[in-house]
């Protein structure tokens, strides 16, 4: 478990103190994939790097597995960092070393394994990330996605309990991003690693995370399960991220719907309810006609969800609303 207890970070620049992270408390459970999302300058990178003390906190306490990381001396910190892997946006591979040597580097520096043991471990790691045939290649011979897979293998080399991902997919194309996220999900599931990732893309959060914290101006403005935050955003920053992900402009949508008669509602379905024939049933039972104005079906991690924007006309409107709520469908009345 990772706990932030009123942790804050301030930089001193040209004689002025610039807050990067306001006093923040947060708990990340073992085995979770936890996402920190925010625009540039929100404080997410600072928060991530505080976990392994690449950034030193200005105050507060960071507890990992019951131990106060902020109180570690240099020797304790070195040992702790071997339990925390990290992957980066720009891969940070050594150009003069082969793929195998890049992955072996942390093990060689630790000095705890023989050469044959290191070679065996590297072979296992390259197989896990799908690069067994690339061991003798150099970084310049790899695609961006392959470079990131090398970075992931290197981060796993010391059998960490925690994996920190610093914008790990932001330099990749959508297809490669999807494959890297799938790999991270497999690693989380099979190795029971706690993964903390930062991103500015809601799609990344939706694909792989269990819980998410939304950051803005150095503070967490909203947090919860990905389904709660993604489907029912409360803070304006969260709503902007969701709109960007859905590629929806609410102002334009309101204008488009201005001429549509009746009540306009947005329904959100999760799990099995996503595929249930609810609209037809409600229409028959209440006499309410409907027009579908917008809709989508997608997934949050492995759970399907659907959203429909409807115009409802005639019949027993209150009975229709009650029927939607009884079916455990979230309903938002837009007009």
Curated annotation (Swiss-Prot):
List where the protein spans the membrane.
none
Which key words tag this protein in UniProt? Amino-acid transport, ATP-binding, Cell inner membrane, Cell membrane, Membrane, Nucleotide-binding, Translocase, Transport
Q: What membrane topology does the annotation report for this chain?
A: Peripheral membrane protein
GO CC annotation, single: plasma membrane
Reaction equation(s) it catalyzes: L-methionine(out) + ATP + H2O = L-methionine(in) + ADP + phosphate + H(+); D-methionine(out) + ATP + H2O = D-methionine(in) + ADP + phosphate + H(+)
Q: Where in the cell is it found?
A: Cell inner membrane
Q: Which family does it belong to?
A: Belongs to the ABC transporter superfamily. Methionine importer (TC 3.A.1.24) family.
What is the name listed in the Swiss-Prot or TrEMBL entry for this protein?
A: Methionine import ATP-binding protein MetN 1
Tell me the classification of the organism that encodes this protein: Bacteria, Pseudomonadati, Pseudomonadota, Gammaproteobacteria, Pseudomonadales
Provide the gene name from the record: metN1
């Amino acid at each position: 478990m990772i706990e932030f207890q009123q942790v804050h970070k301030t930089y001193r620049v040209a004689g002025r103190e610039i807050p990067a992270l306001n006093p923040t408390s947060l708990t990340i459970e073992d085995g979770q994939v936890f996402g920190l999302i925010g625009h540039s300058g929100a404080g997410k990178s600072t928060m991530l790097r505080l976990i392994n003390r690449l950034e030193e906190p200005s105050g507060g306490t960071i507890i990992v597995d019951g131990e106060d990381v902020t109180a570690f001396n240099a020797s304790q910190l070195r040992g702790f960092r071997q339990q925390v892997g990290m992957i980066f946006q720009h891969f940070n591979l050594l150009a003069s070393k082969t793929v195998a040597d890049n992955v072996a580097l942390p093990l060689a520096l630790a000095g705890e394994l023989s050469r044959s043991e290191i070679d065996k471990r590297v072979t296992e790691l390259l197989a896990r990330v799908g690069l067994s045939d690339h061991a003798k290649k150099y970084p310049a011979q790899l695609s961006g996605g392959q470079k990131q897979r090398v970075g992931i293998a290197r981060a796993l080399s010391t059998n960490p309990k925690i994996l920190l991902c610093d914008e790990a997919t932001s330099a990749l194309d959508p297809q490669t991003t999807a494959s890297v996220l799938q790999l991270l999900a497999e690693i989380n599931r099979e190795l029971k690693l706690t993964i903390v990732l930062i991103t500015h893309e809601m799609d990344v959060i939706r694909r792989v995370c269990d819980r998410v914290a939304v950051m803005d101006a150095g503070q967490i403005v909203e947090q919860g399960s990905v389904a709660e935050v993604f489907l029912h955003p409360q803070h304006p920053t969260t709503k902007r991220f969701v709109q960007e992900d859905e590629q929806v402009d609410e102002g334009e949508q309101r204008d488009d719907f201005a001429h549509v008669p009746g009540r306009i509602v947005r329904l959100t379905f999760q799990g099995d309810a996503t595929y249930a024939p609810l609209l037809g049933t409600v229409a028959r039972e209440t006499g309410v006609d409907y027009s579908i104005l917008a809709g989508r079906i997608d997934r949050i991690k492995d759970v399907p969800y659907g959203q429909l924007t409807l115009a409802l006309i005639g019949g027993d409107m209150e009975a229709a609303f009650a029927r939607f709520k009884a079916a455990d469908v979230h309903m938002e009345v837009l007009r």
